[in-house]
Regions:
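Hydrophobic transmembrane alpha-helices of multi-pass small-molecule transport proteins
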Residues: 50, 71, 120-142, 162, ...
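Membrane-interface helix termini and inter-helical loops of multi-pass transporters
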Residues: 23-31, 90, 139-151, 201-217, ...
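Transmembrane alpha-helices of multi-pass small-molecule transport proteins
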Residues: 30-80, 107, 164-171, 185-206
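Glycine-/small-residue-enriched transmembrane alpha-helix faces in small-molecule transporters
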Residues: 1-41, 147-174, 194, 198
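Specific transmembrane alpha-helical segments of multi-pass solute transporters/efflux pumps
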Residues: 21-22, 51-101, 137, 226-235
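Juxtamembrane C-cap of transmembrane helices in multi-pass membrane transport proteins
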Residues: 14-32, 45, 83-92, 100, ...
Length: 235
């Protein structure tokens, strides 16, 4: 298969899983899992999965310094993104949260312009203006409903999560270009998982879903979130 076609198909699958993920998380949060506990579930599962998968992969070279950088990047960037994302989606609607996720490329561009002197064109500025305008309109007009307990706060938190993830993407790309993909996943998820366990120990573990049977609807939805959006979409 042509590499470009393969890349496009991978992107389509990843975005589709992301869309299903938003609706699945909205179903689970906060009724079946508290947002902080949900973050811990995802990151611990993801870290365990990537370390297990790496056993069957070709070894990748990395220095101790790079591994520590990845660990800290995961503890701050990956965990920060996941924490704000799940907290935000528990308050707003899947449609609104998806709008803010789609703004990540805008924040990446803004960060690279401010800190890495990326070239600015009028077309790029127009695109940023349209994207931000749509987001502001969404925040200003989002009404409360059965799916959104606090739409305004949820939208703003999702906005913060998209900015945090953009920072994570820029830093990981600029500082760690020589690191293999599996090494990146292993150590960023490990750092994020450790941070999630620390935070969860402070706030407390809250997951009524653990009293459900394995084949109950909430548990099957959780397994989907853990296996597909959390693990497969990153590979």
């Amino acid at each position: 298969m042509n590499k470009q076609v393969e890349a496009n198909l991978s992107m389509i699958v990843s975005k589709a899983l992301g869309g299903f993920n938003m609706n699945a998380l909205k179903y689970l949060l906060p009724l079946w899992i508290a947002p902080v506990t949900g973050v811990t579930f995802r990151l611990v599962f993801g870290a365990a999965a990537f370390w297990l998968i790496d056993i069957f992969c070709k070894p990748e070279d990395s220095t101790t310094r790079q591994r520590w950088q990845l660990f800290l990047l995961g503890a701050l960037g990956m965990y920060g993104y996941m924490f704000f994302y799940l907290l935000g989606i528990s308050m707003t609607t899947p449609v609104s949260s998806s709008i803010f996720v789609s703004l990540e490329p805008i924040w990446v561009f803004v960060i690279t312009v401010l800190f890495y002197k990326e070239k600015v064109t009028w077309m790029k500025l127009l695109g940023i203006g349209l994207g931000l305008g749509g987001a502001i309109l969404c925040i200003a007009t989002q009404p409360g409903d059965d799916l959104a307990s606090n739409a305004m706060a949820g939208n703003l938190i999702c906005l913060v999560s998209s900015i945090v993830y953009a920072i994570y993407l820029v830093v990981s790309n600029r500082l760690l270009k020589g690191v293999g993909d599996m090494t990146l996943l292993k150590y960023t998820f490990l750092g994020a998982a450790v941070m999630s366990l620390i935070v969860n120990s402070i706030y407390g573990f809250e997951a009524p879903i653990m009293s459900m049977s394995l084949f109950s609807t909430p548990m099957l939805v959780l397994l989907f979130v853990l296996i597909f959006p959390t693990t497969i979409s990153y590979l």
